[in-house]
Amino acid sequence: MTTLHVHSTSPARRLVRRAVNTALVAAAVGALVYVERQTPVEQEGAGAARIPLAAFAQQPAPPRISTSWFCPGVAAGDGLSAGRVVIANPTEAEVTAAVTLLSADGQEQRQVLVPARTQKSVDVLNGRTVGVVVPIVEVIGALASVEQQSEFAAGDVTASCTTATSSTWYFADGVTLDGSSMRIMITNPFPETAVVDVAFTTVDGRRRPTSLQGLLIAPRSVRSLSMPDEGAADEQRVAVEVKTTTGKVVAARAQHYLGGGRLGYSTMLGVPQRLSKWWFAGGNTGANIVEQLVLFNPAEDDITVDAVFTGAGLSGDVANGVAAPSATTSVAVPAGEVVVVNAGNVEGLPEGVHGISVSTKDGSTFVAEHVINQRVAKSNFTAVMTGAPDELATTTWRVPSGVTPGTPRALTFVNTTVFDATVRVSAIGPGGEFPIPSLQTIPLPASGVTVIDMPLDATTGELIIESDQPIVVQRRLSRGRQLVGFSGVLALPQTGANSR
């Protein structure tokens, strides 16, 4: 475990450091543009190292001169009451961040100072009640991290941000029944126009409307597409593909669920590429719970996807390093179609929490999302989560905005190996990184799942989760306003730890 040491710094030295950081941020923003225009790899930020699956949300490894965080965007037009980015600085030095807000009104820039070992919340709406605002945060180095938070009457949401753009983005899940809204927000953070083609798939098949081909996304701007207005109204399933023919972008989805068995709000980044294996940490079956895996095959060939459910009582004896799962299902996903797997129909799957891996034996790639619809008392809620790439299962995860003390079932750990693991949770406080005493030797069985409550005396600071085996970590969050249920979001895997 890394310890952050505290050193005293004179006021004059702090002023010099602040001036240097400001200059570095300005230089890094310019370098961001230069690197993107000169190289085809999906990396941004001065000194960015080549990292695997760069456009997936993750904590990049140093050394980096600066890191750009691209957030999904806040849909003020949906009626949100607040939107913000949270910048977490775990280091012993003040960090300077440049925050750029992109909207239909152009761009707004500001400089933010984040004191050592703290988090800084930055409002992104500034009173706006229409349109979409997309925050981009440029920070010095690679250790600070960023998340986006939205407050809405239908449920508060925390969303991950990413440190890279991509030429492709996919969304497996989507619903527009009974007036449910669905926005696809496409952001071009660069000084040259991006050209984008958008297709969507419903139960009637794939469509490529002429109006969604060759879309021009102006430099440093955001384009919001209302899918019901684009020909996908009153649909039970809407999967979306965003592909650029020129440039790279960031694409996100905002959903307000009003029908079709769903209720609530979600905002999240899309999936930047198809993969052959995904992990989900928030599985749960039981009374009044409908758990679904949404599988999208944008390719030209049919595929078969295997879903394996892991957890207590779900794995047999380990032979030759491989556990024999007792709850599995295989499903054919035709080319260009979406297939939904109802976990409640999987033979041998007991009620309760579990992890899930979905994969193909032949390496065919696809996109997957996980949906929980649950009835609580006289209300219900919907929680939608993206999966973690198998390659990003790792031994260190971070939670930039922390977890509210006393939150029940706050963190879920899934062991992606056939070896027993031990997990420990630390936090960032005024004196640096420190262990949370009751969370230092958390057992996580081979191919198992462990769920923990956050202690009442825990800090609200950034969390660091470490394991001696590769794991996947998901956080559970309150929806606020005394609403029933929860929302879920993956923690940030730390690049450079012992990932696969």
Q: Whereabouts are the PLM-identified features?
A:
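Post-signal-peptide, soluble extracytosolic/periplasmic N-terminal scaffold domains
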Residues: 43-44, 51-57, 76, 86-116, ...
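Hydrophobic, ordered structural segments
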Residues: 113-114, 118-158, 189, 223-261, ...
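Terminal targeting segments of Actinobacterial cell-envelope proteins
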Residues: 1-16
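Conserved functional hotspot residues at active sites or interaction interfaces
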Residues: 21-25, 32-84, 144-189, 248-298, ...
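Long, internal scaffold/assembly segments composed of regular secondary structure
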Residues: 216, 243, 274-344
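Hydrophobic alpha-helical membrane segments, chiefly transmembrane helices and signal peptide h-regions
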Residues: 17-38, 97, 240-242, 305, ...
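Intrinsically disordered, low-complexity Pro/Gly/Ser/Thr-rich segments with frequent PxxP/GP/PP motifs
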Residues: 49-52, 102-130, 134, 206-235, ...
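Short acidic, flexible loop segments centered on an aromatic residue
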Residues: 84, 88-107, 138, 186-208, ...
